[in-house]
Amino acid sequence: MEFDPAKINTSSIDHVTILQYIDEPNDIRLTVCIIRNINNITYYINITKINTHLANQFRAWKKRIAGRDYITNLSRDTGIQQSKLTETIRNCQKNRNIYGLYIHYNLVINVVIDWITDVIVQSILRGLVNWYIANNTYTPNNTTTISELDIIKILDKYEDVYRVSKEKECGICYEVVYSKRLENDRYFGLLDSCNHIFCITCINIWHKTRRETGASDNCPICRTRFRNITMSKFYKLVN
């Protein structure tokens, strides 16, 4: 059975997008709740609403060696702290349609989806997630800087921090971060120890090289030791 975008109903509550896939002739109803994180432009998917057993399976899996290793590598590759790869919305009257455990979409597509025994539901879930991301991802021309209009579409209140961010250069490659050729490189890698500016690609390469050589994780400029790298669309974290 092929995924059919025409069968998707969308709605939203606060900052959560609700996708309902309804295929009555085949008795299929699937609800997927997605949070789009503003700072690093990534997606968190509610696995509780997909199947209540998935959340318990995930909590057990992440305690095992394979789970711990996967999450460690994902945190390193994305620049997102391990504790921020999951989010929880608590069950209450206001949140009854969106409560549950939300996890980074990479964990859903590459791990959790394999725990679903119904191959049709697997296929539809994959289609829903890919459809949502494809329709909610900004794709500015690779030869130009990211446009101010794209950022303003995220949230108007970020206009001031964007205005500063668009002038910032990476302290390693000395390129303006928003002017880098590839879209995936147009993110900042924020250190928890200082305010020096780096693009996410350069600081991740620096971090990986230091680890491989057994050196400590120090800022390339001030040499202050850091513990975490946070991937962000802006030069500093914003609430």
Curated annotation (Swiss-Prot):
A zinc finger (RING-type) spans 170-223. It catalyses: S-ubiquitinyl-[E2 ubiquitin-conjugating enzyme]-L-cysteine + [acceptor protein]-L-lysine = [E2 ubiquitin-conjugating enzyme]-L-cysteine + N(6)-ubiquitinyl-[acceptor protein]-L-lysine. GO terms for biological process: protein polyubiquitination; symbiont-mediated perturbation of host apoptosis; symbiont-mediated perturbation of host ubiquitin-like protein modification. Gene3D superfamilies: Zinc/RING finger domain, C3HC4 (zinc finger) (3.30.40.10). It is found in: Host cytoplasm. Keywords: Host cytoplasm, Host-virus interaction, Metal-binding, Modulation of host cell apoptosis by virus, Modulation of host ubiquitin pathway by viral E3 ligase, Modulation of host ubiquitin pathway by virus, Transferase, Ubl conjugation pathway, Zinc, Zinc-finger. Its EC number is 2.3.2.27. InterPro entries: E3_ubiquitin-prot_ligase_p28, KilA/APSES_HTH, KilA_N, MKRN-like, Znf_RING, Znf_RING/FYVE/PHD, Znf_RING_CS. GO terms for cellular component: host cell cytoplasm. It holds the Pfam family zf-RING_2. Its main location: host cell. GO terms for molecular function: acid-amino acid ligase activity; ubiquitin protein ligase activity; zinc ion binding. Residues 21-131 form the KilA-N domain. The keyword Zinc applies. The vaccinia strains LC16m0 and LC16m8 encode a full-length E3 ubiquitin ligase p28 unlike the majority of the vaccinia strains. Belongs to the orthopoxvirus OPG021 family. PANTHER family: IP09428P-RELATED (PTHR11224:SF10), MAKORIN-RELATED (PTHR11224). RING-finger E3 ubiquitin ligase which catalyzes the formation of both 'Lys-48'- and 'Lys-63'-linked polyubiquitin chains. Plays an important role in virulence by acting as an anti-apoptotic factor. This is Host range factor p28. It comes from Vaccinia virus (strain LC16m8) (VACV). The gene is OPG021.
